[in-house]
Design a protein with these regions (language model features):
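Conserved beta-sheet core of the metallophosphoesterase superfamily
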Residues: 11-13, 18, 23-30, 75-138
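Conserved catalytic scaffold of divalent metal-dependent phosphoesterases
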Residues: 1-88
Length: 140
């Protein structure tokens, strides 16, 4: 889920990013259901062929629903992002999920905060490199 990484003097939160998208209420409900312990136990009892069919169905359904949602719902909620900065006591977050590759530099409570968003693996694959005390977001 969430992982704290220390890069020299930098404390970095690495997260999937879906928990930052709190305006997408339908997705958050789905996420809660699909990650429920009971749901996971039942799913793990199924054979691989059935699991693959379910995953394929859900992927297709998700793609269709995503295409029908407004862009602002599909992006992070800035208040939630600020809550994560506070909760994890960091000023750097690296995440995916939204697939909107970018480096966001914002001010919050008088300090600079950075959010590195990785791109979609199919359309704009990217990765993070840390060298010379700098974090870089690069294209593959």
């Amino acid at each position: 889920e969430n992982y704290i990484l220390y890069l020299d003097d930098k404390k970095v939160l690495v997260t999937h990013g879906d928990l930052l998208c709190t305006d997408d209420i339908d997705y958050q409900k789905f996420r809660k259901f699909i990650r429920n312990k009971i749901t996971l136990k039942i799913f793990n009892l199924l054979n691989n062929k059935i699991k693959t069919k379910i995953a394929s169905f859900l992927r297709g359904k998700s793609k269709k629903l995503t295409s029908q949602k407004p862009d602002d719902i599909m992006d992070v909620n800035n208040n939630t992002v600020n809550e994560f900065f506070d909760k994890f006591d960091t000023n750097i977050i690296i995440h995916g999920h939204t697939h909107r590759k970018n480096i966001h530099n914002t001010k919050y409570m008088g300090k600079n905060f950075f959010r590195y968003v990785l791109g979609d693996w199919h359309n704009s694959p990217s990765y993070i490199v840390y060298k010379n005390n700098k974090i870089e977001l690069l294209d593959i």
